[in-house]
A protein has these predicted regions:
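Boundary/entry segment of secreted carbohydrate-active catalytic domains
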Residues: 1-24
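Carbohydrate-binding surfaces of carbohydrate-active enzymes
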Residues: 4-6, 35, 77-80, 88-92, ...
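Aromatic- and glycine-enriched glycan-recognition loops and surfaces
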Residues: 20-39, 60-84, 143, 213-214, ...
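Short, acidic/polar
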Residues: 21-38, 141-152, 241-248, 303-311
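Catalytic domains of carbohydrate-active enzymes, especially glycoside hydrolases
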Residues: 27-52, 311, 402-403, 407-409
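Aromatic-lined carbohydrate-binding/catalytic grooves of carbohydrate-active enzymes
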Residues: 37-73, 96-114, 118-119, 170-181, ...
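Active-site-adjacent "subsite" loops/lids of carbohydrate-active enzymes
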Residues: 90, 94-156, 186, 190-204, ...
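Active-site neighborhood of glycoside hydrolase catalytic domains
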Residues: 140-250
Length: 683
């Protein structure tokens, strides 16, 4: 497959309208391709049909962009890129298509208020008046998609396609969705959110399947003409809410995972791990903008350190990096970005490409459960009141990742499909709202193979409750609570006590013990004297503990050779350092012996992997803001490797080592600026 070894990619983002004759009047394909070649770009994503719906090639379907005056920009780019040894990924927009929206009102997505998306102004979530959104369930729109994809693949030869915007940006109540749901279920579309209602849950799952099925349809349109063309669907909305309908099932319709992100380096390392594990083939591709921090800031460029961090973080996870640049409306580019900035970065990172694509060493695996993209507390409300960024779904597992990075616990992020073969010492279910039966089958299999679980917040399946010996009875009325350690839990809850319990600034799940065999209560629930929003209070500035209960809020359960820890709320989301330490101790207890250890500071990530029998380590300084401060005196301890030579790549410069604790190799790193890559047993 052409993607193998193809790590350096580029997209010139150009969703440009054509009402002004100035728009795209200064396009210069030769200048652009020359810039890409000089920078060392291996693949160019080229716009074929953007969000405007105005084709950048002579089309018989819809309309061509007037500013091109008949010039085949797309076809010329394909030709020039191939002449210069650059692969081409054809860009095609889906669902976001202004031409389709305006020309075919019957195709439009219809909100719960009965409006099309361009009827809104100045609102978030694409309700700005700019984006024309159509419904993927509409048969007429699907025929249009098929015709467009057939046309592009018939007219041109390219290596891959990026099918963008594979998600619902809103809940759709158009006639097509209403009819489809009625045909499939015999019911009208629901308009009230209730996460305790099986019909509502079934509807949300149905929408997930609609998007996955649509993705499969679009992919089949490409493969029917050019089976060898790779397909990448937009997968960044996996981090969004249930509204998107974007789940891991989309991976059935792609050749590799990819999507654009703008959330910083902790988010990137989390997503890169997830993509690496769910992608059908590698490398996956991580997109982010040249603009700082995102495309809205059209003229502001990220620092060289920041872009270097993006590229190397993707690379060590065996991911390609795609720079999303922003073309000026007149079609001109900023060539210095390529002849200077990106050339320097790619010249440096390409030296490390031969050493990646190994098997990561890790102790913990965070399960990112894409079928549970909701906050169970956001219930019994109208659909129009929904949140587009639900608490917990993304926040909780990323918070867990933050603590693991801080404490130098090597970790992975996995999808549902990975659980069946998961070998992590501990799997983390960080506030997973719901676990499907087939997912529970995989979890039970993992436990039967000796794996351990950490679960926080909801116990999302009755079978899991039974394994724990607990029965969930509800949720605290208090939204500010405490965990009081028992004698058995005192070591894990070090720093907290009955008098000074661990603060939880949120609700707790309530559960009662129904089977105490092999169960140890680590902490019990404590509540403030009053609610947080009442006239009465104990202390005017705070909510001190006052109501002590015997109700369990942290337990350790032994199940065969495996152990499960459950906490009634995600301690990993706590801000105080002492509280995060409790989460770390729980993970450390469950994982046992570490794959490797380090004293690296909290924002420095150490990754280790084995490729073809050789061990490698990368140390990445993932500070979120430039300038990146240099770090000193970092060491890595690797058990069983004493006496091995360690070289700093790419120049094979030997680094200082020593033997500690008999068979442990301690690697002393030189000054860390942005990153280091090391090889054990150097040439």
């Amino acid at each position: 497959m052409w993607i193998e070894g193809n790590y350096r990619r580029n997209l010139m983002d150009m969703h440009i309208d054509d009402w002004n004759p100035e728009f795209l009047s200064r396009l210069d394909v030769d200048e652009y391709v020359d810039a890409l070649k000089d920078a060392g770009v291996q693949a160019a994503m080229v716009k074929g049909r953007p969000h405007t719906g105005l084709a950048y090639y002579p089309t018989k379907i819809g309309r061509m962009h007037a500013g091109l005056k008949g010039f085949d920009f797309f076809g010329t780019m394909v030709q020039k890129c191939h002449e210069n040894g650059i692969a081409v990924i054809a860009y095609f927009t889906q669902i976001f298509d202004n031409w389709a929206y305006e020309t075919h009102p019957e195709w439009r997505l219809v909100t719960e208020e009965g409006k099309g998306m361009r009827e809104y102004r100045g609102m978030k979530n694409f309700k700005t008046g700019r984006y024309g959104i159509v419904c993927p369930n509409n048969a007429g729109y699907r025929q249009y998609v098929k015709d467009c994809l057939t046309e592009m693949n018939t007219m041109y030869d390219f290596e891959g396609m990026f099918l963008d915007m594979t998600f619902f940006p809103e809940v759709c109540y158009c006639p097509s969705c209403r009819r489809k749901y009625m045909d499939e279920t015999g019911r009208e579309l629901p308009r009230k959110i209730d996460w305790q209602d099986e019909e509502w849950l079934a509807y949300v799952y149905q929408r997930d399947q609609w998007i996955a099925e649509y993705a499969g349809f679009a992919t089949s349109c490409v493969k029917a003409v050019k089976p060898q063309v790779t397909v990448e669907h937009q997968f960044s909305r996996i981090t969004g809410s249930w509204v998107d309908g974007s789940t891991e099932d989309i991976m059935k319709a792609v050749d590799y995972a990819g999507g654009d992100y703008y959330g910083g380096f902790l988010q990137q390392t989390f997503i890169n791990k997830y993509y690496k594990n769910v992608s059908p083939n590698l490398p996956f591709v991580y997109h982010t903008s040249r603009c700082d921090p995102e495309l809205v800031y059209h003229t502001t460029t990220k620092t060289e350190e920041e872009l270097l961090l993006h590229v190397i973080t993707a690379l060590v996870h065996n991911g390609a990096f795609l720079l999303v640049d922003a073309i000026n409306p007149d079609g001109s580019i900023v060539p210095e970005v390529y002849h200077g900035l990106m050339k320097r970065i790619y010249d440096r990172t390409r030296q490390y490409e031969p050493y990646v694509n190994g098997n990561l060493y890790y102790d913990a695996a965070i399960w990112f459960a894409s079928h549970a993209k909701y906050d169970p507390n956001e219930t019994d409300i109208e659909v129009r009141e929904k949140s587009f960024e639900p608490s917990y779904y993304m926040e909780a597992p990323v918070a867990a990742a933050s603590v693991l990075r801080e404490k130098n616990v090597p970790f992975e992020v996995i999808g549902t499909g990975n659980i069946w073969e998961e070998k992590a010492k501990v799997m983390i279910l960080s506030h997973v709202a719901r676990i499907r039966e087939e997912e529970m089958d995989a979890i039970e299999d993992y436990l039967a193979r000796g794996g351990n679980l950490y679960i926080s917040g909801p116990i999302g399946n009755e079978r899991l409750q039974k394994l724990l010996g607990l029965k969930v009875t509800g949720r605290t009325k208090h939204n500010f609570t405490y965990m009081s350690p028992t004698e058995e839990g005192a070591e894990l809850f070090e720093g907290f006590s009955h008098v000074a319990p661990l603060t939880i600034d949120r609700y707790q799940v309530e559960a009662e013990i129904v089977d105490d065999m092999g169960l140890t209560v680590l902490a019990t629930r404590t509540l403030p004297y009053t609610m947080t929003d009442t006239y009465e209070f104990a202390a005017i500035h705070s909510n001190p503990p006052g109501i002590y209960t015997e109700s369990p809020c942290a337990v350790l359960k032994k199940v065969g050779e495996s152990r499960i820890i459950w906490t009634a709320a995600p301690i990993e989301m706590s801000r105080p350092y002492m509280s995060r330490q409790v989460f770390y101790r729980m993970i450390d207890l469950l994982r046992g012996e570490a794959a490797f250890t380090s004293n690296a500071p909290k924002f420095v990530e150490v990754l280790g992997w084995n490729k073809d029998g050789t061990d490698y380590y990368a140390v990445i300084n993932e500070q979120e803001e430039s300038p990146v401060a240099s770090m000193y005196d970092i060491w890595i301890d690797v058990k069983g490797k004493a006496g091995q030579k360690v070289c700093l790549l790419p120049d094979n410069r030997e680094v200082e080592t020593e033997t500690v604790e008999e068979d442990t190799l301690r690697i002393h790193l030189p000054k860390l600026e942005v990153f280091h890559m090391l090889r054990l047993g150097g040439e």
